[in-house]
């Protein structure tokens, strides 16, 4: 007869009417009993002939992901002008006095952040925007381009101008200016800076970039004479020595590169193609129109170039016109020809935009290193989009980067730290990742972009195969005209207007701030916010500030104090250049919602939405049907989060873990499902540990156990010899049940770790419930008062040790120690409030 749920509960000693613990508990360590129970509950995985279930409720296997939904009305979020102050360490020191070594080290890590992958794989530009939404290809293309453009305008991306120069918007950092005024990085292999060597004494100063993108400052220093002179006469040798150093093997005019598989050089060729260039720029580029076709590979550089013979009049504009503007001069091929759209506007704006600042960068190919696509900002906000950047190449393969590890507070540390009678609020840091600047040397490794609209559309329509040499013909121009494209562009014209032209051009962008798709970013963000919170805790000694990634919480003893702290802390953070979103500040009262938990003075529980998810999961969980182990991973992930709040904890999930490890299907028996369901319907809070003196000690040998409870000594023997770890665990359980003490001394490291997953399954489940809420103190065997009783010697009494226990907050970054928080509120709270005490500047 199969094991019923009631029998199973009784077996696990979860019911009140169980026999004496010293007799019942060792039975659960018996391997034979564990095997019989496992077989009865189908936990011994049979060879299954029934097809596996690949979907349980919302949980699907990792390889059958949910289909993302495209929203044509997505709003691109706006990014404030985020600029973290470079002298952040000095500012903090002015505010709070000298920083600790740990705080300084962490802040230096992100000023600027550096990224050195082992090797970088470059992908063609066509892979820049992922065809994630096959039904909305064009719409997705423009939405993504607009998002990238917004990021560039906000100073979060660099725009590759040539292989060795980039432009950006926003305020420059000194390491970016260093690159501008002389020293530059010589190729990807060299990271050190090397000053320019003067090649000709007649040239007064060196500009790192071409004439069309000089800042006004440089133009005034160089004067227009130097631009028009040597450049207009086409003396390439001298113009080279003015603009950049050249390798003798690849001597060619500035800004022109050999075209690689038909990709555009993003800068000079398109600048020349702009119909809206200033006369100065035209003069500066006049010599290029004659030399451009002699670039080192046979065909022209510009993607969509037309041979001179086919342009209607060369006087109207430069020879190499752009794909979009060519439609203006061509005959419409049908009612849905793009020329109808292009002729709607006389002035489509420039073909390309340049940033406010220009810098020298290591050699950057016209390629991307990761693809991008858009998704909903989060499950609760589908109106705004979020950019997903896939730089997974750095986490895969033989050349993968092992990201630095950092301490994340575990549940007990978090409870010890935050479970108190404080009032809480949480701050929302807007676009937290984009606060941290990246060194320009990282740019060649973190490239995103797109190959331009025509190539993107052509690549996705299966009927037209692109051959690079076809680009020159007019007939080829109309190959991309279709009703679908025309209708999409007409609708998008309402949204983007003349920007359609700008976005239809190819572009390559590199990250100037850390992107979310790289494993280094969470580490850097965690270091940064933990250092800032450490500074805040010392600046405001009555405040408990704590952070995990971009989630920052403040706690104070009363609501009034919290409000005044909130004002002071926000002003301090704003003065460092950290952008907070005041609309998203949440005031939690006395129970804080943080990292998926609700933390109050009573302890910690999972948030309501997680318990709802668990209930829903059990409702949809099929019985007696094999479930794909990848779906089990998802189920275990959810149940594992709430496991510490259940009676039996993680050990109850061990059968699931075992099947995932063996990559086999798992079948839920009615009893096992009922057992788990009951476990998760009643959740118990995890309480904070209290400091205290240890009075109860346990010890065991394979054959017997011994306890020291105050001055009392006890001993007992096992029916059969047991493995030493199992014996020690049993002794700890007996100590807890006999004394009721929440603090037990033991010399066994496995018991100390409170991880009972490696014990026989039934024993692990029962022990977890008996020892729930118990704290352990390590006592060396030689000093353990329970050592003698465990060996059967009751006559000798070792003196009790004075073993103090201090709850740990783990390796969470509390470098500046917070003042201790009283466990109860006194009748009248007195604190040095900024409201009552006159404030003196630091």
Swiss-Prot record:
Signal peptide: none annotated. It catalyses: DNA(n) + a 2'-deoxyribonucleoside 5'-triphosphate = DNA(n+1) + diphosphate; Endonucleolytic cleavage to 5'-phosphomonoester. Keywords: DNA replication, DNA-binding, DNA-directed DNA polymerase, Endonuclease, Host-virus interaction, Hydrolase, Inhibition of host innate immune response by virus, Inhibition of host RLR pathway by virus, Magnesium, Metal-binding, Multifunctional enzyme, Nuclease, Nucleotidyltransferase, RNA-directed DNA polymerase, Transferase, Viral immunoevasion. GO terms for biological process: DNA replication; symbiont-mediated suppression of host innate immune response. Residues 184-238 are annotated as: Disordered. Mg(2+) binds at residues 428, 550-551. Residues 346-689 are annotated as: Polymerase/reverse transcriptase domain (RT). Residues 197-208 have a biased composition (Low complexity). GO terms for molecular function: DNA binding; DNA-directed DNA polymerase activity; metal ion binding; RNA-directed DNA polymerase activity; RNA-DNA hybrid ribonuclease activity. Activated by host HSP70 and HSP40 in vitro to be able to bind the epsilon loop of the pgRNA. Because deletion of the RNase H region renders the protein partly chaperone-independent, the chaperones may be needed indirectly to relieve occlusion of the RNA-binding site by this domain. Inhibited by several reverse-transcriptase inhibitors: Lamivudine, Adefovir and Entecavir. The record marks 63 as: Priming of reverse-transcription by covalently linking the first nucleotide of the (-)DNA. Residues 212-228 have a biased composition (Polar residues). The keyword Nuclease applies. Residues 1-177 are annotated as: Terminal protein domain (TP). InterPro entries: DNA/RNA_pol_sf, DNApol_viral_C, DNApol_viral_N, HBV_DPOL, Rev_trsase/Diguanyl_cyclase, RT_dom, Viral_Replic_Matur_Polypro. Its EC number is 2.7.7.7, 2.7.7.49, 3.1.26.4. Residues 178-345 are annotated as: Spacer. Hepadnaviral virions contain probably just one P protein molecule per particle. Multifunctional enzyme that converts the viral RNA genome into dsDNA in viral cytoplasmic capsids. This enzyme displays a DNA polymerase activity that can copy either DNA or RNA templates, and a ribonuclease H (RNase H) activity that cleaves the RNA strand of RNA-DNA heteroduplexes in a partially processive 3'- to 5'-endonucleasic mode. Neo-synthesized pregenomic RNA (pgRNA) are encapsidated together with the P protein, and reverse-transcribed inside the nucleocapsid. This is Protein P. It comes from Hepatitis B virus genotype G (isolate IG29227/2000).
């Amino acid at each position: 007869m199969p094991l019923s749920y009631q029998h199973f509960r009784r077996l696990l000693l979860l019911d009140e009417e169980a026999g004496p613990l010293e007799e019942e508990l060792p039975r659960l360590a018996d391997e034979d009993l564990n095997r019989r129970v496992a077989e009865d509950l189908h936990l011994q995985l049979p060879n299954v002939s029934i097809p596996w279930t690949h979907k349980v409720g919302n949980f699907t296997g990792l390889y059958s992901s949910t289909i993302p939904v495209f929203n044509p009305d997505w709003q691109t979020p706006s990014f404030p002008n985020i600029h973290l102050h470079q002298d952040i360490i000095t500012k903090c020191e002015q505010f709070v006095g000298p920083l600790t070594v740990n705080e300084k080290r962490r802040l230096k890590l992100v000023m600027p952040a550096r990224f050195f992958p082992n090797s970088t794989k470059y992908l063609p530009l066509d892979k820049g925007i992922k065809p994630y939404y096959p039904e909305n290809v064009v719409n997705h293309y423009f939405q993504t381009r607009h998002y990238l453009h917004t990021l560039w305008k906000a100073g979060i991306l660099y725009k590759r101008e040539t292989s060795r120069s980039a432009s950006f918007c926003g305020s420059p950092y000194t390491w970016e200016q260093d690159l501008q005024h002389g020293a530059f990085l010589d190729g990807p292999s060299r990271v050190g800076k090397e000053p320019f060597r003067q090649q000709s004494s007649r040239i007064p100063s060196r500009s790192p970039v071409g004439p069309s993108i000089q800042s006004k400052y440089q133009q005034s220093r160089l004067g227009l004479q130097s631009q028009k002179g040597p450049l207009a006469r086409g003396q390439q040798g001298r113009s080279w020595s003015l603009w950049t150093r050249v390798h003798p093997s690849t001597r060619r005019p500035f800004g022109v590169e050999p075209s690689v598989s038909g990709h555009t050089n993003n800068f000079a060729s398109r600048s020349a193609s702009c119909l809206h260039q200033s006369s100065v720029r035209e003069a500066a580029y006049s010599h290029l129109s004659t030399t451009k076709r002699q670039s080192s590979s046979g065909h022209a550089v510009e993607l969509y170039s037309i041979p001179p013979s086919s342009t209607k009049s060369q006087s109207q504009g430069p020879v190499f016109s752009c794909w979009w503007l060519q439609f203006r001069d061509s005959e419409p091929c049908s009612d849905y020809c793009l020329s109808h759209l292009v002729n709607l506007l006389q002035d489509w704006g420039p073909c390309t935009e340049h940033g406010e600042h220009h810098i020298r960068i290591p050699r950057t190919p016209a390629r991307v290193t990761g693809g991008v696509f858009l998704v909903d900002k989060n499950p609760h906000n589908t109106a705004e989009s979020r950019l997903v950047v896939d730089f997974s190449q750095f986490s895969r393969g033989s050349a993968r980067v092992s990201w630095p590890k950092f301490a994340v507070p575990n549940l007990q540390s978090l409870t010890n730290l935050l479970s108190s009678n404080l009032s809480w609020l949480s701050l929302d840091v807007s676009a937290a990742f984009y606060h941290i600047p990246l060194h320009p040397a990282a740019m060649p490794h973190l490239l995103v972009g797109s190959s331009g609209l025509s190539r993107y559309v052509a690549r996705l329509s299966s009927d037209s195969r692109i051959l690079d040499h076809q680009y020159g013909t007019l007939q080829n121009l109309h190959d991309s005209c279709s009703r679908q494209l025309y209708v999409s562009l007409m609708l998008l014209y309402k949204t983007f207007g003349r920007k359609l032209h700008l976005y239809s051009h190819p572009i390559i962008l590199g990250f100037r701030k850390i992107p979310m798709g790289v494993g280094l970013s969470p580490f850097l963000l965690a270091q940064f916010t933990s250092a800032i919170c450490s500074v805040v805790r010392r600046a405001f000694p009555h405040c408990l500030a704590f952070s995990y990634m971009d989630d920052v919480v403040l706690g104070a003893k009363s609501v009034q104090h919290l409000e005044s702290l909130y004002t002071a802390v926000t002003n301090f953070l704003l003065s460092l250049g950290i952008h907070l979103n005041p609309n998203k500040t949440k005031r939690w009262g006395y129970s804080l919602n943080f990292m998926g938990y609700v933390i109050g003075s009573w302890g910690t529980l999972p948030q309501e939405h997680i318990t709802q998810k668990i209930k829903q999961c059990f409702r949809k969980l099929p019985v007696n049907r094999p479930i794909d182990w990848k779906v089990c991973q998802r189920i275990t992930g959810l149940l594992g989060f709430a496991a510490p709040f259940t009676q039996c904890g993680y050990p109850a999930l061990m059968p699931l873990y075992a099947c995932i490890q063996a990559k086999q299907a798992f079948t839920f028996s009615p009893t096992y499902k009922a057992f788990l369901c009951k476990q998760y319907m009643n959740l118990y809070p995890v309480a904070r540990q209290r400091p205290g003196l240890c009075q109860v000690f346990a010890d065991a040998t394979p054959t017997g156990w011994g306890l020291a409870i105050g001055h009392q000594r006890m001993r007992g023997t096992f029916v059969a010899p047991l493995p030493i770890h199992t014996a020690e665990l049993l002794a700890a359980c007996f100590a807890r049940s006999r004394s009721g003490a929440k603090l037990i001394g033991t010399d066994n490291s496995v018991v100390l770790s409170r991880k009972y997953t490696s014990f026989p399954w039934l024993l692990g489940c029962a022990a977890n419930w008996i020892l729930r809420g118990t704290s352990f103190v390590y006592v060396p065997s030689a000093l353990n008062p329970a050592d003698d009783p465990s060996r059967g010697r009751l006559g000798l009494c070792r003196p009790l040790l004075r073993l103090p226990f201090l709850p740990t907050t783990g390796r969470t970054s509390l470098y500046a120690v917070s003042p201790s928080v009283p466990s109860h509120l006194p009748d009248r709270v007195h604190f040095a409030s900024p409201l009552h005490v006159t404030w003196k500047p630091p």
